[in-house]
């Protein structure tokens, strides 16, 4: 695969690369040597960073392969999401329930109370570990796509009239309960079902 196909995640191929090159040749470019040097330096930096990212992802893959966590058995759970979730939560015995993990991630509903007034439109708190919240959100989207049980649950919540993000937050709570159960029991998803 060429670098444009890789960088565009498969959206553009060789034809688009040729089209871009021809457009660049036909366009009016700067003849200043400083700009050319800056462009070469920037390209070199991008290539070095891409190489470092590949090394880090390889290291993460090796660590996850050694740990072999049960949450990877959930259809749709990716290695990077699993790594962030496990790293942010750490020791699952520090949490007495899945709700504590949700609160730690800042995914529990906020409450507003003043005198006799109680907030009836609770919003997600968005306190806590934003990395865990982001990883759980992304993992939930993929799990809902690849796992028929979660896809059905998300469709059910949408049929109840809930906004997509609200329905997804319900699926996220379900996913956290599943992750908690799998990690505590050591069972894989297929054997737990």
Regions found by a protein language model. Give the residues of each.
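A detector of single, family-specific signature residues
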Residues: 1-193
